[in-house]
Amino acid sequence: MSELLNYVASCRLPTEWGVFTMHGFEEAGGQEHVALTVGDCSDGNPVLTRIHSECLTGDALFSKKCDCGPQLEAAMKAVQAEGRGIIVYLRQEGRGIGLINKIRAYHLQDQGMDTVEANVALGLPVDARDFRLAQSIYEYLGIRSVKLLTNNPEKIQTLKDAGINVVERIPLHVGENLENKRYLQTKADKLGHLMSE
């Protein structure tokens, strides 16, 4: 399929918000990723999409430290409402540092550091994700043009650099609470996320 990912299998995935088709992909090193699709995404028209990085704490454990779970839920609802779209779910926990390192970083955040300071203090990258994986999935599914649900300009640029036409960026401002207010501000101030529209 591509040098980054290989397609493995697809299945029907009924959810609280509707039925998706789940497509499984695997990196050469064994890391697995999925894409959830609704409708025909390969007809050449711009496809509503979200590139979502795995967040066990937010997506599955409902942590209020981040906005990941609410973003995933909002994206799934939006794709179902549109009747056509794709959610690329990349297994890049903790902005790519892994779950255990994320727990270590959370410990430092509990002591007063922000999300960027904690990663740096641990000698870890601030963001180690590789959004080119999404481009490989789009390529396999025949997607060349997207409407991207994101606040992260790096996702937009990576797709543009890969030849994907990003016709629209749709802000995804959900899940703010007292626990994650500083985290969201840090994403805006230090990571360039577009949090004010």
Swiss-Prot record:
It comes from the Bacteria. The active site is at residues 127, 129. Pfam families: GTP_cyclohydro2. Its EC number is 3.5.4.25. Binds 1 zinc ion per subunit. GTP binds at residues 50-54, 71, 93-95, 115, 150, 155. Transmembrane segments: none annotated. Its cofactor is Zn(2+). GO terms for cellular component: cytosol. It catalyses: GTP + 4 H2O = 2,5-diamino-6-hydroxy-4-(5-phosphoribosylamino)-pyrimidine + formate + 2 phosphate + 3 H(+). GO terms for biological process: riboflavin biosynthetic process. Zn(2+) binds at residues 55, 66, 68. It is an enzyme of class 3 (hydrolase). Pathway: Cofactor biosynthesis; riboflavin biosynthesis; 5-amino-6-(D-ribitylamino)uracil from GTP: step 1/4. GO terms for molecular function: GTP binding; GTP cyclohydrolase II activity; zinc ion binding. Keywords: GTP-binding, Hydrolase, Metal-binding, Nucleotide-binding, Riboflavin biosynthesis, Zinc. Catalyzes the conversion of GTP to 2,5-diamino-6-ribosylamino-4(3H)-pyrimidinone 5'-phosphate (DARP), formate and pyrophosphate. Belongs to the GTP cyclohydrolase II family. This is GTP cyclohydrolase-2. The gene is ribA.
